[in-house]
Amino acid sequence: LVVTHTVPLRNQWAKEVEKVFGFKPGIIGSGRFELDAPIVIGNTQTLYRNVDKIRKEFGTVILDEMHHVSSPTFSKILDTNYCRYKIGLSGTIERKDGKHVVFRDYFGNTLFKPPKENYMTPTIHLVASEIRFMDGAKIPWANRVTKLANDEEYRHTIAMLAAAYAAKGHKVLVVSDRVSFLKACSELTGDKSVCVTGDVSHEDRETLVDEILYGDKNVLYGTQAIFSEGISVDTLSCLILATPVNNEPLLTQLVGRVIRKKEGKISPVIIDIHLKGNTARKQASNRVGFYMKQGWDMKYL
């Protein structure tokens, strides 16, 4: 049993299982409840509602994006299951809130890491900007991010960077957690860009992502929530961090979106924008520390 927490992730697993093993997996979710296949992929919510029906059915349970295991929905599925093997998968085994300490309670102490040769080494391009990110401990973080996202000059900067790197042959991923900002930047970039946010249906998301994978679109604007986990678009080779990131596990996952090996792919690049202001400067130096720890080359533009 493979446990996933979104429909696109479930669909992605189903595609890969069919590609690798040559048979269609069973699906639990979206009105289906199929237990006959050797591999079954299920949605958390449906599995949670049917815990009694599934708990003695499987010998192995794989939990994708296992950093969600501390949520009651996931933990109940695992706690009640009679399976012999439990395997957790995640791009990052740390959580900012420290709850990663429960991982070993569920999955034991053995940790397998994929060999580094599955990944390419990115170069970091540090872009100095004159745009200011608001300081002030009393101003909520969300308000500060919104103010930055509504800054016309900042929107043009992001759109211009995306277009410039796309012109160099990159397939560019721009991530932010402000939907209106992403849509505005996508319009500025022009018809070679697509925008994937929470209000796009799962079917349409796949169509838009396919335009990046197989079509002539070369800039993908997407929300952090969608692209920090689960969606793999191996052709992406450039990441633009359009919202300040001060969370190492999140940064690890976002960078992971563009450094996967693929034949004919150009060397990946991460665009890190350094804004004015004390908060921005402190966060930027934390990110630079992270890049140094990974041993990645950095260039100031």
Where does each model-flagged region fall?
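Conserved interdomain hinge at the start of the Helicase C-terminal
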Residues: 136-187
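Post-DEXD/H (motif II) to motif III coupling segment of the RecA-like Helicase ATP-binding lobe
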Residues: 59-60, 65-125, 291
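C-terminal helicase lobe
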Residues: 136-143, 262-301
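Conserved SF2 helicase motif VI
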Residues: 90-93, 238, 246-270, 288
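Conserved helicase ATPase core of P-loop NTP-dependent helicases/translocases
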Residues: 11, 22-36, 49, 173, ...
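Conserved Walker A/P-loop ATP-binding site and its immediately adjacent core
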Residues: 1-19, 95, 177-182
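Conserved helix/coil segment N-terminal to the catalytic DExD/H
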Residues: 29-60, 71-76, 226
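A short beta-strand element within the Helicase C-terminal
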Residues: 56-59, 221-222, 229-244, 252-253, ...
